[in-house]
Amino acid sequence: MSDHTNPPSAPPDDDPNGGSLLMPVTLEEEMSRSYLDYAMSVIVSRALPDARDGLKPVHRRILYGMQESGYTADKPYRKSARINGDVMGKYHPHGDAAIYDALVRLAQPFSLRVPLIDGQGNFGSMDGDPAAAPRYTEARLARSASFLLNDIDRDTVDFQPNYDDSEMEPRVLPASYPNLLVNGADGIAVGMATKIPTHNPTEVIDATLAMIDNPDITLDELMTVIPGPDFPTGGLILGRSGIRSAFETGKGSITVRARTDFEEVRGGRQAIVISEIPYQVNKATLQERMAELVRAKQIEGISDIRDESDRSGVRVVIELKRDATPDVVLNHLFRFTQLQISYGINMLALDGGQPRLMGLRDVLSTFIRFREDVILRRARFELNKARDRAHLLVGLAIAVANIDEVIRLIRQSPDSTSARIALMERDWPAADVAPLLTLIDDGGNVLTEAQTVRLTEVQARGILELRLQRLTGLERDKIHNEMQEVAARIGELLEIIGSHIRRMEVMREELAVIRAELNSPRRSEINDSLADQDDESLIEPGQMVVTITRDGFIKRTPLDVFRQQHRGGRGRAAASMRGDDIVTRSFNAHTHQWVLFFSSGGKAYRQKVWRLPEAGPTAKGRALVNLLPELGSDGITAVLPLPQDESLWEGLHLVFATASGGIRRNRLSDFKNVRASGLIAMKLDEGDRLIGVATCREGDDIMLASRLGRCIRFQANEDTLRVFAGRESSGVRGMKLAQGDEVISLSVLRHVEATPEERAAYLRYASARRRSAAGEEDQIDAEVMEADDSEVTVDDTALSPERIAGLEEAEEFLLTVTIAGFGKRSSAYDYRVSGRGGQGIANINLAPRNGRAVAATFPVRPGDDVMLVTDAGRLIRVPADQVRITGRSTMGVTLFRVDKDEVVTSVFPVLETESVDDNGDDADSVAPAAPDGQVTDSDD
């Protein structure tokens, strides 16, 4: 039985001398070495381009293979399958698919700035469509490829054996222009990657010429010539900082944006037309992403997307809805789709066989050094060829000059060998060819002091092969002229070889020719002003009326849409209701204001007014759940427009009130960062709900009003209502409620230090003055108004003129509106300040006539307008100054004539509006307003 612990080993492989050929090695060492070999193979032989010609091995082999097979620009197209086979069989044994994919990319005008292959057939599209099979497509080298391959047969670059040593292939192509910059590169190696953008060929050549003229040229000077990448698909490049970083260090990131315009399409609608898309963006995928965002309602305002692209170029039309803001929709498309991309630049290339991160100056200087070496090697090759030709011409010239003697020697020789030897052993006069012999300088023809030379074997063979027609006088002149041309050419080549300056001149001349051939206008615009714009900067500022319905629909409507009417009118439609949906909340805000939304469940959300959907007065709006995620079944019961100037937020507090009479005060900064999904604003007891939120400062007065006509006023200070540190507290009791009652309004009032007697005296004086002005004064009013100038005494309380002026300046008025459309204005001095948690005092005298319930109570200022909205969706705008000022315990006057079973659901002030008198002639008015603008039924 074998030992499982030590199994028998395999017999060792022995060398002829009896020693073992097996070398023990650890697994770690072998894996490390093998992986390193693999990594270097991928880096050097597959993924990274060479900095000299800008090509990866597969691209280089395709171009060289097509050149060797004669598939040049001046020849007919050849089947791609044949090209595939030639390249795979001779140079690149890695599968036909890999070769064909690389060939296709070289032919795509949307992939390369200067395509190197001229393709015929379906070579793919910007929609990501694959190319047709290689048996269907044809190709040949493009004219631009010749500038990479020219002089490859003149010993300009080194060659190496192919994979099976059956062919020789170039290590690099003798590129005549910096193809690495012109066509860029993409590749992922092991542990590294390259991503080099394309550039404008004219600019790249100009930059190369600038560096030739001034090798110490700065990057800033270069960037005036080559300002940045130039993509074949065009587009806009935003800013230059990323470009400079990439040009300086080899790494950087640029923002590329599609080129778009606004057009008017059918029906007078606006459309966004895309004419250029960012580089390497799949157009079909881009449109699919847009459609997904529209279906998910992440982008609003798009009605249709269609692709009208054709051979003339890209054209994608995005039709917008009538209520959409084109700039905002476009900004959302930039933000959420590949209409705008961040293109990361990593200019990694092989320099001397080693990966190197290269900046713009590095790439250009590397190319210039390489190109100078190509020119030098070409000159040496051509010099050798010219000298060989000159060497032969010397022999022919000597033979022609001594033709009789040459013929005699040949005729006397028994055979060609003897004739050749006879020619080589004779001294020939060479005074006429002495200058050329000096240029040849090959040691074959040694000029003696007697100005004679002996012919070499090559020259002797050339003479023997000379045709008789070359012996004519004309042919002798041709030989002489050619000798002069070759001599001049040898002189030029010697100058090129011996002078760096001359080589730079040659390079400059050749680049000028290529520049004229590849001249192309810039396609990608570099825009310094189009930085990332936020949506808000695109929105025109203005006042909006925001309306929220019970079923959770919201809209914003420009304030000037609602024309002002006298109180007592019938109003106009504020929203088109469906079913039994009613308006539950409306408020006035600026488009650029932050608005805090508070749900009945105590959650807070934040949104800018301009982000709310805009709609006309009769439109219903859109569902709030599309704007406020995770709202659930809770309704929005409180909204709070915050000051537009965020510096005013300092020192502001938020006061929360619940239907059960609870209240809490927090710092506004606790709600400065509200996440998209909302956050807990107030912890509520079961069955309770949030009814209002307001901003206040330390020392302000808080007033709660109940549905059954009660109210309470107390001061917001540390003694009465402290600032809570947390958001999840349920707060403290603000008002004690009777059975069946609930808090319906929260107001913040200015705190004024005044005794009860001073408040009562001032109220009596102010009432008397108003009655006197209206011609309604009685005897008591007259007595009050006849007081001397030093002070006013009312009910034994003396008020100085200064005190009256101070109280008048600080006076606020509270408007209370019932569900039946009745309302009144009362001075805030009529509401005494008490402690928190009491039952409060009467706010209004309720009766069946005025509705038995309060809709709202809030402060108004002179000049304010007030809007009342009913559950039927009707709205009226009334100047607050037309509502008579009465005492606290009165029934009010008619503000809004409501129909039977119609109730007022929302009342809010409209500030700083222009008065537009509407006498009831508007088509949207249901009934005319009172002609004199006064109360139609006095219920005081």
Curated annotation (Swiss-Prot):
InterPro entries: GyrA, GyrA/parC_rep, Gyrase/topoIV_suA_C, Topo_IIA-like_dom_sf, Topo_IIA_A/C_ab, Topo_IIA_A_a_sf, Topo_IIA_dom_A, Type_II_DNA_Topoisomerases. The active site is at residue 136. A motif (GyrA-box) lies at residues 565-571. Its main location: cytoplasm. The keyword ATP-binding applies. One of its GO terms (molecular function) is ATP binding. It catalyses: ATP-dependent breakage, passage and rejoining of double-stranded DNA. Residues 48-538 form the Topo IIA-type catalytic domain. Its EC number is 5.6.2.2. GO terms for biological process: DNA topological change; DNA-templated DNA replication. A type II topoisomerase that negatively supercoils closed circular double-stranded (ds) DNA in an ATP-dependent manner to modulate DNA topology and maintain chromosomes in an underwound state. Negative supercoiling favors strand separation, and DNA replication, transcription, recombination and repair, all of which involve strand separation. Also able to catalyze the interconversion of other topological isomers of dsDNA rings, including catenanes and knotted rings. Type II topoisomerases break and join 2 DNA strands simultaneously in an ATP-dependent manner. This is DNA gyrase subunit A. The gene is gyrA.
